[in-house]
Amino acid sequence: MDPKEKKTKQEEELKVDDIQDTVEGQSQNEEATEATEPLTAEEKLEKELKEAQAQIEDQKDKYLRLSAEFDNYRKRTVKEKAELILNGGEKSIKSILPVIDDMERALTTMETATDVNAVKEGVELIYNKFLSILSQDGVKVIETKDQPLDTDYHEAIAVIPAPTEEQKGKILDCVQTGYTLNGKVIRHAKVVVGE
């Protein structure tokens, strides 16, 4: 081949390569511009819708978990309350059991005892032990001896003439002992008052 023809052929090949490069570059530029072009209104709405749906699912999941947690809490508190009602007096009952044991021993002893004073002392010990146990649970005896009548703590069931002037308006006798539990009256003392 002639050098001129060779040169022309090479130039043509170069031109073809340049054209191919240009076409490839244009298609790549078009793809890049398509990627960087702003989204259409429809595409924006679709994107916002997907984001909103994802947020809704997330909030729904949180709500369901919180609802289940609250339901479990409510069930647990109902169960605990039922147990408290059922077993609330267990501590008090357990503390009274030794008094019952002492009473059983006293009853057994009374069948064969000949000394009345010993039996009396035993019963007094049991009574004092019982009062001690009650006081540990917050139960206190309402004082009545030589006290003025206080309707918050005392219930006057009878009024009799006072033997002395000093005893007017005061309690002369206690028919039934009253008690408080942690400062609250659980039974008023039934008393006789002088007038």
Swiss-Prot record:
Similarity annotation: Belongs to the GrpE family.
Assembly, per entry: Homodimer.
Localization annotation: Cytoplasm
SUPFAM superfamilies linked to this entry: Coiled-coil domain of nucleotide exchange factor GrpE, Head domain of nucleotide exchange factor GrpE
CDD domains: GrpE (cd00446)
GO biological process: protein folding
Record PANTHER family: GRPE PROTEIN, GRPE PROTEIN HOMOLOG, MITOCHONDRIAL
UniProt-recorded name of the protein: Protein GrpE
Record's keyword terms, sorted: Chaperone, Cytoplasm, Stress response
